[in-house]
Each structure stands twice: as C-alpha cells, then as structure tokens.
C-alpha cells in the first residue's frame, strides 16, 4: 500500500483544514504504479484540493519535519515575488536525502547521474538552498521532464503578474521505502481565482531504462 507522508509539523502550525485529507484517497495513491511513458498524470480532473479558506495574498512557506526514516513530507507555500530569489542557487551537495546514491548511467542518461537532489518547492520559487526538509532523492527524469515545467509555469506567472500561487508538493512513499514513487503537485493562482495557474498532477519518480529499488535507492539497468 502506498502512503502519503504528512508530518505532524503542519498540523502544529496550521489548522487541519490546510492539509486536505482527500489527497490521501486510494485513486491518487494507485497512480504511483501506473507509469505509462508520460512524466505525469492529472489527478482529480487537474483540480487542486485546496479549500477556499486557504486562499490568501500573503506569502508563506512551510516544510514538514523529516519522519523517523529521514523522509520529507508535505511542502506548502503561497508563492509571491517576495519569496523568489534574486541570487544564484547555493551549494546543496552536502545534503543526502533518504535513499540517496551517487550513481551514473552514461548508457541511458545524457547528464550521467541517475539521481538529483530534487527540491519539492523549486529554488526559483522559494529561494531555499540546502533545506533538508525540501530535498528528496529524485531521478533526473522526475526533476527535469516532470517537475520543472510546472515550476516554470508558476514562476513565470508570478513574475509577470505579481500575483500569488498557492502551491503544495507531496512526496508519495510506499510503506517504509526510502525513495518516493513520485510527487503530487498542486497549484492555484489566488488573485484571479485559478485563471492564470491551476493544476493537480502526480509526477513519476522513474528513469526510463533504469530499474529502481524504492526501498533502498539501489538501481540497475533494465534487462
């Protein structure tokens, strides 16, 4: 059974209404085993699970505490221009997220390395560098083909309009696995009631041509 990891941290700082329990429904969780060649799949008709009482024009960012296995939980923010960085990203190589392995596959990966330290909330949105509560072990495919286009959409919208985007990224783990099966990404532009940005997707943490042991992070070329 696949589970979404929600740390109690969010409940301590925000009322339960802010962590919508519907995001744990079985239909969403089963998507983790249904990769069909696309980096992502729409969830809930591409409609995010936010409630109207969550919408605000004040920027914020909240990160879950790591669980007992050292895994990240929900990352939740209201992205505004004031959160976005004005300097280049700093060093993050000292962070070793759960399930991390440094391994190369030049046969199938142009950039060589299987894993990236993937920001749940991208650096261009939050300015977070080596925040261990915001970095998971993710494939190059997850990072570049899956998450980045959605992050770019949010970043471009905020820069162009000065508006806010409510944004939540939830890593999905199976049982006690150290590597996430993927992430659920939700976004909603606040001031224009979702006309500029609105999506709810599950992005697969896979790498074509590579077989991953999600329990440990070990990997091998597919036969």
Each model region followed by its residue ranges:
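Domain-level detector of nuclease and nuclease-like folds
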Residues: 53-223
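N-terminal, intrinsically disordered, polar/charged segments of Gram-positive cell-envelope systems
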Residues: 15-59
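Hydrophobic membrane-insertion alpha-helices, especially the h-region
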Residues: 1-13
